[in-house]
Amino acid sequence: MAKIRPPKPKRMGRGAQRCQRCGTRDAVIQKYGLYLCRQCFREIAPTLGFRKNR
């Protein structure tokens, strides 16, 4: 069998940033330096001062 190198850590692209709260790499909001996934953002948005516009 051939030796397999371990993957390099991602430095750019969609999978490079992680959610600071849960650690997932899916749908991370980077705006305003939040670095939260959309699920975590919806949970704590009111405490951060964001409100829903209609």
Curated annotation (Swiss-Prot):
Zn(2+) binds at C19, C22, C37, C40. InterPro entries: Ribosomal_uS14, Ribosomal_uS14_arc, Ribosomal_uS14_CS, RIbosomal_uS14_euk_arc, Ribosomal_uS14_sf. Its cofactor is Zn(2+). GO terms for biological process: cytoplasmic translation. One of its GO terms (molecular function) is zinc ion binding. Binds 1 zinc ion per subunit. Binds 16S rRNA, required for the assembly of 30S particles. This is Small ribosomal subunit protein uS14. It comes from Aeropyrum pernix (strain ATCC 700893 / DSM 11879 / JCM 9820 / NBRC 100138 / K1).
